[in-house]
């Protein structure tokens, strides 16, 4: 078994079942729709049909990035198991999530000095981001090391 985990954001544009099958945990962005905040949990809290029906009826969604505290809560269980983390974020050009991830990384590196956390700015979104995650999972599944996957 690899001593690292590859993680991403829910904005990766891949289905929940695919991410679970490929063992790619994801941290949820959040959005507000009709005054109610939802986690972007890939259709668990609200189905895509309901989501798009609300938009068709005039609702306007707003989104919020993952903050550093959410990253800490998301990553800490992996670190407690002794796993290094390779996390790929949504492009820093359209979200502050990369900066939040870097703040969490610095905090957790002090708490877990013997483990590695690498944060990669995908510089992409949607399908391009998803393809990158699929490629990284392929490398990991072929037995590539943490450092090789990061490179």
Predicted regions and their residues:
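A short helix-to-beta-strand connector/capping loop
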Residues: 2-3, 21-22, 113-116
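N-terminal glycine-rich anion-binding loop in soluble enzyme alpha/beta folds
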Residues: 5-70
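Residue-level detector of anion-binding/catalytic polar loops
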Residues: 25, 84, 145
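A short glycine/small-residue-enriched secondary-structure motif
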Residues: 45-52, 75, 80, 107
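Glycine-rich phosphate- or other oxyanion-binding loops that anchor nucleotides, phosphorylated ligands
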Residues: 56-94, 99-103, 150
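Active-site histidine-anchored catalytic micro-motif
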Residues: 81, 90, 96-151
């Amino acid at each position: 078994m690899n001593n690292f985990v590859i993680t991403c954001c829910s904005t990766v544009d891949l289905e929940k079942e695919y991410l679970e099958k490929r063992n790619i945990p994801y941290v949820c962005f959040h959005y507000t729709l009709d005054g109610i905040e939802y986690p972007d949990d890939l259709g668990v809290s609200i189905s895509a049909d309901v989501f798009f029906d609300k938009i068709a009826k005039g609702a306007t969604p707003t989104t919020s990035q993952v903050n550093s505290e959410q990253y800490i809560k998301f990553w800490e269980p992996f670190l407690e198991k002794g796993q290094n983390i390779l996390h790929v974020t949504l492009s820093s050009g359209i979200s502050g999530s990369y900066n939040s991830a870097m703040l969490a990384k610095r905090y957790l590196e002090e708490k877990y000095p013997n483990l590695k956390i690498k944060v990669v700015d995908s510089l992409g979104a949607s399908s391009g981001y998803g393809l990158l995650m699929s490629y990284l999972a392929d490398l990991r599944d072929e037995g590539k090391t943490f450092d090789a996957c990061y490179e």
